Amino acid sequence: MTMMISEVTFNKIFPHAVKGVYQAISAQIEKAGCVNKMQQAMFLAQCGHESGGFIRFKENLNYSWLGLSQTFRKYFPDPLTAKKYERKPELIANRIYANRLGNGDEKSGDGWKYRGRGLIQITGKDNYAAFRKWLGRDIEPEDVAGNLDLSVKTAVWYWKCYELAELNSVEKVTRRINGGLNGIDERCKLYRALMVTDND
């Protein structure tokens, strides 16, 4: 399978990407159902946004109290609550991911253990279990962030599982990945940049 978007173009759009990520994606992207330029551009734009330009393969939860109030208002409804959790990533994860995605309550520690990792930032005990089943071998959540091949495969699994290659809309794909439209402007910008460039 040939990538419809060249490595030169990829490097222009994601200049700080981890070395080898383009090759790792190229080797797997067809398994995600991304066989044309539009589908590949969508995959790269969304994964590029989720991983901070293919730099971070682990969710950053080091929020200020104001960031918590703005991003996770449901879990931090007032400044006093937000200030108790400020700059405490493990406590933040355990609160925002408690009792959902297969995780236990806040005290279980599941939120931190199963926080977002990989290109697509898979999150939650249920998603990690489903990914392990698809992969056909047992892995620990921490293995995903430290292994480029696994980081790419989480995105391939997620893309295939949720049939994202069939959604020809940045907004629709973003909602499936994010649950809302966080970062929609950047996602659209990346997608357009990947689509307008010619194969070098």
Curated annotation (Swiss-Prot):
Signal peptide: none annotated. InterPro entries: Cell_Wall_Dynamics_Protein, Glyco_hydro_19_cat, Lysozyme-like_dom_sf. Gene3D superfamilies: 1.10.530.10. SUPFAM superfamilies: Lysozyme-like. One of its GO terms (molecular function) is chitinase activity. It comes from the Bacteria. GO terms for biological process: cell wall macromolecule catabolic process; chitin catabolic process. Belongs to the glycosyl hydrolase 19 family. This is Glycosyl hydrolase family 19 domain-containing protein HI_1415.
